[in-house]
Regions:
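Glycine- and other small-residue-rich loops at beta-strand/loop junctions that grip anionic moieties
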Residues: 54, 94, 115, 144-148, ...
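Mid-domain Rossmann-like dinucleotide-binding core that forms the NAD(H)/NADP(H) cofactor-binding site
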Residues: 109-193
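Glycine-rich cofactor phosphate-binding loops and adjacent beta1-alpha1 units
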Residues: 133-144, 162-163, 178-179, 183-236
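Glycine-rich beta-strand-centered segment in the early N-terminal region that forms part
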Residues: 5-9, 24-66, 106-108
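N-terminal glycine-rich cofactor-binding segment
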Residues: 14-40, 52-54, 73-88
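NAD(P)H dinucleotide-binding glycine-rich loop of Rossmann-like/cofactor-binding domains
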Residues: 61-146
Length: 236
């Protein structure tokens, strides 16, 4: 295991806020939160390097790990979580993780940007699954991203900047979130009840909200044979 020096940058996500307010059954006090971090390594192969880490620690020996599905490992542990197993999070002054969970940050990438690697990976994975499942190129799909939070915005950026999707809509009831999205991505930003969000009107829907109401709307507005990519589940 390697020690990770006191982080330079940390992200505070909605999961952390849920836990802070006692609404996350997998994160119960007393617990140090935090799983999105960039910082400097104290010792090991990457000593003194600015790095990001994968907060998911797995056994690497089960059938799921060996088939590239580490997220299904029965012995998986996530930083900043105590269910099913406790592991203190990255807000601690020092943390230890296996060396294979640490990745050197390219010199051209700012350490603040590097801290967003984990949610970016979540969003990119969702887009790649949609690419694999879709019967038409993503740049030809009429696409709806439900939710203008971190995952929704990152999905929209990847769809627009990498996949070349120009027929993109982001929906969110919070106008401030929509305004923020408009600063970074060329997309139509609307409320979830906007008249343009019609039944069977989208080739591709990304549900980054994870509520029953968003799931039902996704099912309603996707075209027959279309794709719904779910990248978030809401904890009650």
């Amino acid at each position: 295991h390697l020690e990770h020096r006191r982080q330079r940058q940390m992200c505070i996500r909605d999961r952390d806020m849920h836990a802070y307010h006692g609404k996350d059954e997998r994160r119960i006090p007393p617990l140090i939160l935090g799983h999105e971090v960039s910082g400097q390594i104290i010792n090991g192969k990457l000593k003194d390097q600015i790095s990001v880490l994968n907060p998911l620690i797995t056994c690497r020996n089960c059938e799921y790990c060996k088939s590239g599905r580490e997220h299904l490992c029965p012995d998986r542990v996530l930083l900043g979580m105590n269910r099913p197993y406790e592991r203190q999070g990255a807000f601690a002054e020092l943390i230890t993780v296996p060396d294979h969970n640490i990745f050197k940050v390219p010199e051209k990438l700012d350490v603040k940007e590097a801290a967003v690697a984990e949610p970016t990976a979540v969003s990119y994975h969702a887009v790649l699954l949609a690419v694999e499942a879709s019967k038409k190129p993503l740049n030809e799909c009429r696409t709806l991203v439900q939710g203008g939070g971190a995952i929704g915005l990152l999905c929209a950026l990847i769809l627009s900047k990498i996949q070349g999707n120009t027929n993109l809509t982001i929906s969110d009831p919070n106008q401030k979130r929509l305004n923020a999205c408009s600063k970074y991505v060329d997309a139509k930003t609307v409320s979830p009840d906007h008249k343009d969000i019609k039944e069977s009107s989208f080739d591709l829907v990304f549900d980054t909200v994870g509520l029953e109401v968003s799931r039902q709307q996704a099912i309603s507005v996707v075209k027959p044979g279309g794709i719904i990519a779910v990248s978030y589940t809401h904890l009650r």
